[in-house]
Amino acid sequence: FDTETTGLGGAGSVVFLFGALWFDPDGGAWLEQLLLRQPGEELPLLHRAGELLSAASLLVSYNGKAFDAPILATRRVMNRLPALAPRPHLDLLHVARRLHRARLGACRLTTLERDVLGFVRGEDIDGSEVPSRYSHYLRTGDPEGLRVVVEHNAWDVVTMAALVGLYGEPLDTLPDVDLVALARTYRRARALDAAARVADDAVARGVGDAALRVRGDIAKARGDRAAALRDFAALCERLDDAGLRLELAKLYEHHAKEPLRALELTLAGTGETDAAAARRQARLERKIARAKGSEEP
């Protein structure tokens, strides 16, 4: 869903255009747009928008958590309508930033259309011009200036639907650098099986050390310490990374039961405080001494 408003927030800003796209059980897509033709029609607009939002099992927006949802909630309060029941809300802006910011920088929706989805809108309007177009319509009654605003709103919700589809089955279409970011995003969401599949694909494509590191992190999170150790050990041969040595030292000590190798990594520097490193070194030296003692006849 997406809104067009008379301002950037606050009690005086009004939603004058609401757009929502949803899918029916047969896979058909439906787009509904609600236009506030005059201020006195705000109540029915909010009522119908509330019906559409309440019927959704998942809300999808682009910066909607910070802007669209709060302004709709404020307008409902101002019109003495009850608050809507909470719904799961996927804000694609946060997903896009995690996935694409390293490659694209700014993550405007039109940027994603061009560089991720591969298309460019035709005639469009900058968001900063939208309120003045609506003000002109209220003064003159001429709807022609609103045509591009309505199309802009429709494009926004259609693009969100396309992004949801892309992120659902992304591996063949995402650039290599975005695969690593997607794996990290799945890991943060604790979708570890999906994270592992994406990380495996990134490694298979030869994305590089970043893919190997995230795959090791995911393996560790899944409890597959043997796989994590393999990936971290391969990285440690190429990288001078104190944090990586710390992860590997822990795995050698507690999983592989190789305190000598863990001690070597600790002495090489693990980025810990001096006190923590000293405790780790002392503990490992005791384990090595006990192991030697048990081997003596």
Where are these predicted regions, by residue range?
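TPR-repeat structural position
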Residues: 143, 192, 225, 258-259
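Conserved DEDDh/DEDDy metal-dependent 3′-5′ exonuclease domain
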Residues: 28-111, 115-119
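Acidic, Mg2+-coordinating catalytic module of metal-dependent nucleases/exonucleases
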Residues: 104-180
